[in-house]
């Protein structure tokens, strides 16, 4: 891993056709060791993991090893890891399972939907926040549209960008079945208070149990946090945790951690078929990608502190250079006082009526980045709803650019892209 940190200040010209990638929150390249693990599995473990011959047994061993690697990365147990196609499936699986569990509990108590009065509430209630990924927000909105569930979208603080624990607790109803809050926001990098939410919900569940009310489960989407900071399910206290491989230099598959899967915590399949993953997620396992995911998890377990320290150093240097170059015109949208954030994320705006974020990036010759979440790239001319939710003024949010550095980003590359941004601004409005 290249962790070079030296870079000269001053005027730096980028070689022709040189590109500097700073969109690591959108996706990451595969580490060489991950590519090797994927390739070896393709060559040597091509058999069906459910088969008894050598290639099949080797595939099964690779899957079991990867499961253990993921568990180690998050401080959980291997039997609590379910492989999925990615974060979207994992998040949908949590929501689907919670709805099913709610209705089964109602049936067991002899309270079918048509027996319960509207006042008592017949639909499961979810609590989430206003800055969640679309793979949480859209499934929940779909359930509301179909009158299958009720959802409270708790706003984040306009002071610190975090969801407030007390606001989560105040939203709990007798029919609440799930609180789902991301661990770290993909646009601002703000770390959410998941441990405190879990602790308070656990205490509340003891009171609810005495009244015969359903247990409130806690889920966090850890896509942005993994590989950038230590993530431990025991510290977080969650029932579900979403894992996304391509955010930590792994392949584009994922996994779901479920505490005591099927016993302590309910999980219901969305698909039915061959019975793989203990019937929770059937379908012949994608052995090569699982091998790569396991190797990526190993690298995180071994090097997380090194990765974190390097990214923080580079990100801080980036913000210093931006402030030095653009002075009072720069607005650091992801820097909230007293709030922890991801070590690699810098969301900023250069103030000026001609400096919309997408316009600035279009003029850049070297920088590869985005204005916000890549899944919203078709709405790049609109201010980010996440930034607006965090209290960023509309005129500032319109100009936002999200830079996210990676494991091998250097100070020299930072110097290049700051100069690139400067020339882009000059192109749009003349010299600063």
From Swiss-Prot:
It comes from the Eukaryota. This is Selenocysteine lyase. It is found in: Cytoplasm, Cytosol. GO terms for molecular function: amino acid binding; protein homodimerization activity; selenocysteine lyase activity; transferase activity; vitamin B6 binding. The modification Phosphoserine is found at residue 117. Gene3D superfamilies: 1.10.260.50, Aspartate Aminotransferase, domain 1, Type I PLP-dependent aspartate aminotransferase-like (Major domain). It catalyses: L-selenocysteine + AH2 = hydrogenselenide + L-alanine + A + H(+). Its EC number is 4.4.1.16. Keywords: Acetylation, Cytoplasm, Lyase, Phosphoprotein, Pyridoxal phosphate, Transferase. Its cofactor is pyridoxal 5'-phosphate. Residues 1-20 are annotated as: Disordered. The keyword Secreted does not apply. It comes from Rattus norvegicus. Its main location: cytoplasm.
